[in-house]
Swiss-Prot record:
Coiled-coil regions listed in the entry: none
Protein name (record): UPF0434 protein VIBHAR_01537
Family note: Belongs to the UPF0434 family.
Pfam families per record: Trm112p (PF03966)
Source species of the chain: Vibrio campbellii (strain ATCC BAA-1116)
Signal peptide: none
One Gene Ontology term, aspect cellular component: cytosol
InterPro entries in the record: Trm112-like
Source taxon at top rank: Bacteria
Length: 59
């Protein structure tokens, strides 16, 4: 994931900052507890595609 891309993309729900989870290939919104998948190197920033994170994740 290009770190320059992380500087300009935002959560489509709250417009907050996203962080990159290399192990799971996801972009994480800690505010909304949503994990957006990265498929074939392309972030899928669609709310219906996002996974709701458990309370234990992302700490």
């Amino acid at each position: 994931m290009d770190h320059r891309l992380l500087e300009i993309v935002a959560c489509p729900v709250c417009k907050g900052k996203l962080t990159y989870d290399k192990d799971n290939q996801e972009l994480i919104c800690k505010l909304d507890r949503l994990a957006y998948p990265i498929k074939e190197g392309i972030p899928v920033l669609l709310e219906p595609e996002a996974r709701t994170m458990s309370m234990d994740e992302g700490r």
